[in-house]
């Protein structure tokens, strides 16, 4: 009898929870319509994978790409709508969040064709790979719109879990297993540190979890200048630092870049930084509004360390992927300048613009590396010597992307850095901008060193990998080359296109 009553109570409670969730989805679902499209795409992928054979593999790519394109379309149709808070304050929809969601969707859309040929050659499980990519994209999108501490913690965990699985996808590779283990352990530690910082913020605000309500709670409790807030700031900065991978939170980055499959590295190298930048901007700007001097100082230290260490250590690397890992550490130092400048001097607009260019530059470089790796089986920088004599198109594409990463005019990277540094200079960050300029010159050195190898014609310097290099047939690798061409064109956009891009970015500020 007691068991029967308990069972009835359990059913009633479950029904209430289900009805409440259905009510939220029914009335608030329109606010997450782009995310719902991805969820529907995930369900379709699962159904097709569980009920069909290998002949339906093209459908898996088609559904994944279509879901991402439809999600981008839904975001664009929702452009310039009034900011809205939904799901009981857990999620906020505004133009600022949506432009970061657009960047994440753009990264994923370019990464899927980039990975098609690689997956087929390495005989990796295709359906699971696409599921993890879409789920990580979904987690990144929710992180961009997260409006409370719980969602800010759960969303990146969704992204991180998929990242761990993707980085260890080649289970038979010892380097991949080592990278995944290191990534998982450091990711778990950083999540614990982040939650500990949230607990200090939660307690100091009188039990508030929504970002704006935390500010009101700190005012009511008079704790906005307390030691507890300083402790929360330090722990949260360290936790977010793992996602952004600035120095000194960068130890996992080179190993994960080197050990993971190259398309996975391309995906993680941009999406994680875009999502973490969106989250960091909102966390520092809203709950820590009264501690702006403190978090400005912390971020300045991280930016300086990242720009110096990332670019100096990149010079010594012999692996192309490890070199790009340290290069990305230096690049995030430039992005942090935009976060520090903030809304007052166009810092956010310059950060968003540089992020857009960084996506094209980085993914274009990785597309070239994927193609070269599939045709030669090597990642060593020395093995790129003389590539221009065998494949001028690939060598020229790689050279343009590297020059754009270095910031040489008239490529897109130059104008992105120019606007970012100019905003920092106007904000009075003279020392930070000077470090950025000097380290940009250093980065140009090691990029030009690679380009010199690409263009060399000396037989004694050309390795057997390039001597035996054979271009694939015209119809092969076309998906990778499509992504590469799109990224190369975007990386070489002249400065005349900067003004409309910056104007659009400025309209997204909250």
Curated annotation (Swiss-Prot):
GO terms for cellular component: chloroplast thylakoid membrane. It is an enzyme of class 7 (translocase). It is a multi-pass membrane protein. It comes from the Eukaryota. Its main location: plastid. Signal peptide: none annotated. The keyword RNA-binding does not apply. It catalyses: a plastoquinone + NADH + (n+1) H(+)(in) = a plastoquinol + NAD(+) + n H(+)(out); a plastoquinone + NADPH + (n+1) H(+)(in) = a plastoquinol + NADP(+) + n H(+)(out). Its EC number is 7.1.1.-. Disulfide bonds: none annotated. Keywords: Chloroplast, Membrane, NAD, NADP, Plastid, Plastoquinone, Quinone, Thylakoid, Translocase, Transmembrane, Transmembrane helix, Transport. One of its GO terms (molecular function) is NADH dehydrogenase (ubiquinone) activity. GO terms for biological process: ATP synthesis coupled electron transport; photosynthesis, light reaction. NDH is composed of at least 16 different subunits, 5 of which are encoded in the nucleus. Belongs to the complex I subunit 2 family. HAMAP family: NDH1_NuoN_1 (MF_00445). NDH shuttles electrons from NAD(P)H:plastoquinone, via FMN and iron-sulfur (Fe-S) centers, to quinones in the photosynthetic chain and possibly in a chloroplast respiratory chain. The immediate electron acceptor for the enzyme in this species is believed to be plastoquinone. Couples the redox reaction to proton translocation, and thus conserves the redox energy in a proton gradient. This is NAD(P)H-quinone oxidoreductase subunit 2 A, chloroplastic. It comes from Gossypium hirsutum.
